[in-house]
Amino acid sequence: TLFPYTTLFRSLEILNIVKKYNAMYDPYIDGRGISQPEFIDHMADFGLSGVMQDMVRATRDLVPDVIRHVEQCKRDVEKVNIYLADLKDREILREELSSVEGIIISSSLYNNLEINAEGATKGNALMWLAKHLGISREDTMAFGDGENDVTMLKAAGIGIAMGNGLEIAKNAADQVTLT
């Protein structure tokens, strides 16, 4: 694999922490998100727009119980996406998850957290691609607008944040462009 996965043990630790919250959690295994009907049937309660709901339905495989599926399939997890119904839980959950070793926590939306194995970042992906294509770091450029783009904006020869992006992205970028 290109980047490390979160081990099965660590994935179960993450999911067992997250299940204590009013949250929709989707681990990714073999490039597909895994979800359960109680999440899919109530996506609006987790703040997902109609467009996001369509994307989720198209990219998730349904199982009766996500955690039981992860336990039984015994495969490492590529990523865990979490959508929270109560926004005040986001930073509380982030703090609780920060005790899990070997993971990085980021966010791409106002109501989500994304858990990846340490080292599985957009910045590392950009540098891998540049090396694969024979391009120097200085000759790379990246655009971003959110927390999950920070490593990429910092890694790129030129990092450009969107004018309507989050402050954390703007601070990581070399330049800020129009919206």
Question: Each PLM stretch: what is its role?
Answer:
Residues L126, S136-L178:
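Acidic, Mg2+-coordinating phosphoryl-transfer loop and its flanking beta/alpha structural elements
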Residues T1-L8:
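Short, small-residue-biased leader/transition segments that mark boundaries at the very start
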Residues Y5, Q72, I115-A117, N164, ...:
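Generic structural "secondary-structure junction" signal
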